[in-house]
């Protein structure tokens, strides 16, 4: 762990003046939002190594415990953003857990306090979230760790997460929706799935756009039923989604929380997210053609149900 190299002068991070919206990470409207998101997600896609996976599991477990402590009332999106910070930190720094077995917990606490400030949530007391622990970190140590997290993130605290892509996929595939209430239900269910599946370390292997598409497809299989028969093909055929990664992400999601869409056969595009930078100007017309094709595809087996809460976890989260 690089704690010995931390900044000598601790900068106390205050809450942001404006609440950070995970579904709209930009501070000002973007002229071409999908191109901006795809450009930014490359800087916000963590990749947790096998060596760091144990530390990640411990940090995720601590965040989950805090999230479901009824007395603390931590918002699910605060926990989501906190674990995103953990992933992004671990993708750039190492924790010497053998020498400092408490390091993952300190990282989790610091990421929780940072996320609460970004979300303008009620202040999270470091003492409260450490209640019942064998030993407690003091405020100075937590603030030093906050500073190290911010340095690792290069102060890009407005994370681009899968939640930022949900609205785009829905508007691109359904520019003139006939069932807005059902689409709202699909989005709400996709958000729930993303919050619950996030602690699965394999989810960090997928870009935010792919994770968002997979969650929407899984949600469509649960919520929409026969009312939107072309939804699976419409999302899967977006020209900037890698079909193989989409399938793999769906499998991870199915294994993690018991929900899985049967839409793999509909994922016909092999282009990568980067391709959209050359296509985004025609994305609207392309999505309309995709929706027409998708409406003709009868996905009769796309209604696998979620089998309940996840088995062992439940954390339910671009700068200029």
Swiss-Prot record:
Region: Disordered, residue numbers:
279-320
Pfam families reported in the protein's UniProt record: Cyclin_N (PF00134)
Going by the UniProt record, its keywords in alphabetical order are: Cell cycle, Cell division, Cyclin
Q: Which residues cross the membrane?
A: none
Q: Return the SUPFAM superfamilies for the record.
A: Cyclin-like (SSF47954)
- State if Cell membrane is listed as a keyword: no
- Cellular compartments per GO CC: cyclin-dependent protein kinase holoenzyme complex; cytoplasm; nucleus
Q: Which Gene3D superfamilies match?
A: Cyclin-like (1.10.472.10)
Q: Which molecular-function annotation in GO is an example for this chain?
A: cyclin-dependent protein serine/threonine kinase regulator activity
**UniProt entry tagged with the keyword Nucleotide-binding:** no
| Record-level GO BP terms | cell division; G1/S transition of mitotic cell cycle
**InterPro entries per record:** Cyclin, Cyclin-like_dom, Cyclin-like_sf, Cyclin_N
Q: What family is reported?
A: Belongs to the cyclin family. Cyclin D subfamily.
Q: What is this protein called?
A: Cyclin-D6-1
GN (gene name): CYCD6-1
């Amino acid at each position: 762990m690089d704690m010995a190299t931390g900044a000598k002068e601790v900068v106390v991070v205050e809450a942001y003046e404006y609440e950070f919206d995970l579904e709209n990470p930009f501070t000002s409207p973007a002229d071409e939002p999908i191109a901006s998101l795809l450009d930014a997600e490359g800087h916000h896609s963590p990749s947790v190594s096998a060596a760091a996976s144990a530390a990640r599991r411990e940090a995720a477990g601590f965040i989950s415990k805090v999230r479901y402590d009824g007395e603390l009332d931590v918002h699910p999106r605060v926990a989501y953003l906190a674990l995103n910070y953990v992933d992004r930190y671990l993708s750039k720094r190492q924790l010497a857990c053998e020498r400092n077995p408490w390091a993952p917990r300190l990282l989790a606490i610091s990421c929780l306090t940072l996320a609460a400030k970004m979300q303008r949530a009620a202040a999270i007391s470091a003492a409260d979230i450490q209640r019942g622990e064998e030993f407690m970190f003091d405020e100075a140590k937590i603030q030093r760790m906050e500073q190290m997290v911010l340095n690792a993130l290069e102060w890009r605290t407005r994370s681009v997460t899968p939640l930022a892509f949900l609205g785009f996929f829905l508007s691109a595939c359904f520019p003139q929706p006939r069932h807005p209430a059902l689409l709202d239900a699909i989005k709400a269910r996709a958000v729930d799935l993303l919050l619950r599946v996030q602690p699965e370390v394999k989810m960090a292997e997928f870009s935010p756009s792919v994770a968002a598409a997979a969650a929407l497809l899984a949600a469509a299989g649960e919520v929409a039923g026969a009312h939107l028969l072309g939804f699976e093909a419409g999302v899967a055929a977006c020209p900037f989604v890698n079909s193989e990664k989409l399938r793999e992400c769906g499998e991870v999601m199915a294994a993690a929380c018991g929900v899985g869409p049967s839409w793999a056969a509909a994922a016909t595009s092999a282009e990568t997210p980067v391709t959209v930078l050359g296509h985004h100007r025609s994305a609207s017309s392309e999505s309309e053609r995709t929706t027409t094709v998708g409406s003709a595809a009868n996905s009769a087996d796309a209604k696998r149900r979620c089998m309940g809460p996840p088995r062992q976890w439940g954390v339910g989260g671009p700068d200029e």
